[in-house]
A protein has these predicted regions:
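C-terminal and inter-domain tail/linker signature
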Residues: 1-218
């Protein structure tokens, strides 16, 4: 919502970014039908981590979404916001993995049925890249449990999109963080029918009065 529509909007954006001597590194990139989604490091005067989603028609990008957060970390287990595997495996399991993450988002994140975490998370190996949370099921349970009772209250309200290729699934969720309307992009890696790794970014959604187009964040 912070960029004007069309080629003129992109030209203005690139001109503005060029003043910061930008550096971009695509860490991992995946394809899901007409969509391409990437996990990216940026240095635009400040160091940021983001997800970029593009929709293509006739070989050209026709729609774009992103979610960008200031780089933080390492987290309590020593992981950065982007390290870990980058290649999708188990391509034949794309749809079952998409379904698994969709159920996790609904049951755990939106409906907060934390007693069902074991149905989704590998109890022996769960690698966490959120800068505030350590590895493992117990750390995730603690983080989700406290997310509704402290000053950084997290509420997941609506899932807008699930993009998948093989072992990687990206969810796009609307909600609030600390009472601020926010966008949550969560990338999961799945192995043997369980979630084994997680990366994410959280970004505040600007109020409509600040939008430069009418498309919204989602």
């Amino acid at each position: 919502p912070q960029t004007h529509e069309g080629s003129e909007g992109l030209a203005a954006l690139f001109k503005r970014l060029s003043r910061t001597s930008p550096r971009v590194n695509i860490v991992r990139i995946f394809e899901d039908g007409d969509y391409v989604f990437a996990h990216t490091e940026y240095d635009f005067a400040t160091s940021n981590i983001g997800f970029e989603v593009f929709r293509f028609e006739d070989g050209q990008a026709v729609e774009h979404w992103d979610n960008i957060q200031r780089r933080q970390g390492p987290n309590p287990s020593g992981h950065s916001m982007v390290d870990g595997p980058v290649e999708a495996t188990d391509l034949s399991l794309t749809e079952s993995n998409r379904k698994l993450v969709g159920s996790f988002v609904k049951d755990i994140l939106i409906d907060r049925r934390l007693g069902e975490l074991e149905n989704y998370i590998d109890q022996e190996r769960f690698t966490q890249h959120n800068p505030r949370i350590a590895d493992g099921l117990s750390a995730l349970r603690s983080a989700l449990g406290s997310a509704s009772s402290n000053e950084l209250t997290i509420a997941y309200d609506r899932m807008h999109r699930l993009l998948a290729e093989g072992s990687f699934v990206l969810s796009v969720i609307e909600g609030s963080f600390g009472g601020v309307h926010s966008s949550f992009y969560d990338l999961f890696r799945i192995s043997d029918g369980k979630l084994v790794e997680h990366w994410d970014t959280i970004e505040a959604v600007p109020p409509p009065g600040e939008w430069k187009n009418d498309n919204g964040k989602f």
